[in-house]
């Protein structure tokens, strides 16, 4: 079935909206409030979209909003879709999983959750992700012109031989107490990187974190926007541990040179070919 309007649509449902193979479309805006959204179907507007739920949601068919999207659920969100909006995208849930082929992106992208697990793409001109734990794994990519992360723990880790990437096109702020970047995973900024304990009101790193552990990973700030080339990376942390655990060494014969050396009799002295002349005088005795 379908619900259509050229104006604003306001759906306030106390229990469940079952939108299997259904369409909810409004030209100007949609406000959808319910306990449960089952079988997400198509929810589409040229304007702003608000979706507030009590129960969790597995999103297989992306919401479509030409303006902003404000999504909140008291449960968990698993995103399997290409969730892109034209303006501001705000996503809040108990826990959020953005799967391998999925995307969460807007002009501004704001994420608020307990545990964020990303194996897909999160992007925005401004990207701000706040969570207790941020897990960016394997195929996971978190991008932003200005990218700001806040949490107790950030794990930027390899998975299934893929290395995760967190990258800012201009500025990267990491306001996270404990950071682990591992096995060729990358923390990158085309501009500068700032590391602290939390984010301030301008989404810039503030305070002193406990540690940054870079284990076989890459942390790089290209600093291309600063003509003066001032400090590219600022760590305000107790410990920076930068280790390569899998360094292998071997002896390689790159060249060889012939050397002539000699010694006389039982003499312990070793002479080179240019050491001079050694004369031996031996008395012949007969019995």
Task: List each model region and its residues.
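Binding/recognition "hotspot" determinant
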Residues: 1-287
């Amino acid at each position: 079935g379908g619900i259509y309007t050229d104006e604003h649509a306001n759906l306030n449902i106390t229990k469940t909206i079952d939108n299997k193979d259904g369409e909810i479309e409004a030209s100007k805006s949609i406000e959808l409030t319910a306990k449960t959204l089952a079988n997400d179907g198509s929810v589409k507007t040229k304007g702003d979209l608000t979706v507030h739920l009590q129960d969790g949601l597995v999103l297989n068919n992306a919401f479509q909003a030409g303006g902003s999207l404000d999504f909140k659920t008291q449960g968990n969100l698993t995103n399997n879709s290409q969730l892109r909006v034209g303006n501001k995208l705000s996503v809040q849930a108990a826990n959020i999983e953005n799967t391998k082929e999925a995307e969460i992106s807007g002009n501004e992208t704001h994420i608020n959750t307990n545990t964020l697990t990303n194996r897909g793409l999160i992007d925005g001109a401004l990207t701000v992700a706040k969570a207790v734990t941020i897990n960016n794994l394997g195929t996971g990519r978190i991008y932003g012109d200005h990218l700001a992360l806040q949490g107790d723990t950030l794990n930027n880790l390899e998975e299934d031989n893929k290395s995760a990437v967190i990258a800012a096109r201009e500025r990267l702020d990491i306001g996270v107490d404990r950071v682990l970047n591992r096995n060729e995973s990358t923390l990158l900024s085309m501009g500068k990187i700032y590391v602290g304990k939390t984010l301030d009101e301008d989404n810039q790193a503030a305070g002193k974190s406990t540690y940054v552990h870079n284990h076989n990973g890459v942390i790089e700030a290209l600093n291309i926007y600063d003509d003066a080339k001032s400090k590219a990376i600022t760590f305000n942390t107790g410990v920076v541990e930068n280790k390569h655990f899998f360094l292998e060494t071997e002896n390689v014969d790159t060249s060889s040179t012939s050397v002539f050396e000699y010694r006389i009799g039982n003499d312990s002295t070793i002479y080179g070919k240019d050491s001079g002349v050694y004369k031996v005088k031996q008395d012949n005795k007969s019995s």
